[in-house]
Amino acid sequence: MKKIVIIITTLIAIVGCQTRIKPLTDLDDNQLHGKVKQMLELTYYYGNVDRVFFEEKTKASDSMLYIFDEKGYYTEAVRLTPPDEDEDEAEQTVRKMYITRTADEVKTTAYNSDGDILYQSISKLNPEGLELTRTDVYKKDDEKIVMNSTYDHKNLKREINIEHKDGGKQKNVLTHNKKGQVIKGEFYIDNGNELFLTSTYTYNSKDYLEKRERKYATYSVTTTYEYEYDAQGSATVVKEYEDGKLTTTRKRIIEYY
């Protein structure tokens, strides 16, 4: 199986002026405000193939329905886009996800269109709700990935050590600002010894991600974001540009409690 490079960019918040890291809700991660019941997200890719940009599509490339509980966490996600005509591709595509949450555990189970389990993810949380360990099991690929997180609250850093079933290891180090936003990510491969990618993040006046700069060994990519908002301050349109070229537009239809 092709090695999966996992890049975790979970955004984390700070409580008051204390240098303590606090996990964000799924609403926060999606630039949503208020009590959101569900969000239908239509994604249009204008993207690139081998870094060659193609024309704008008039039909959504992907559509997902996300259901939230009253605390702002996912309970369910459903892909509404018709299954791929390629049977092998369709078999590997997630159609539904169910998420259950307790005080110390989050469990996610993903299914394909046949109702087969594609993967299960179980996160163990500390009393503050921070993820300590996460185990992902991919049924079809016979792959298991274990992630262990440690937190340096004084320096606002999170280190994630990742181990694959075949023994391969990776490491992610995330640095935050005083608002709790990730401002730098360092991603290591080759058993955590080789720096594969460095990312930096800047935010707009609403504290939404405005620019991400990714630096690899031989090239770099700058991604910028533009938003449109509703009366609640939720992002109803998110436009993503890669090196100045529009690559993705996400349009949201949001229903509130």
Each language-model region and where it sits:
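Positively charged n-region of N-terminal signal peptides that target proteins for export
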Residues: 1-4, 18
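Sec-dependent N-terminal signal peptides
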Residues: 6-9
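C-terminal motif of bacterial Sec signal peptides marking the signal peptidase cleavage site
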Residues: 14-16
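Buried hydrophobic residues that stabilize the cores of well-folded domains
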Residues: 18-257
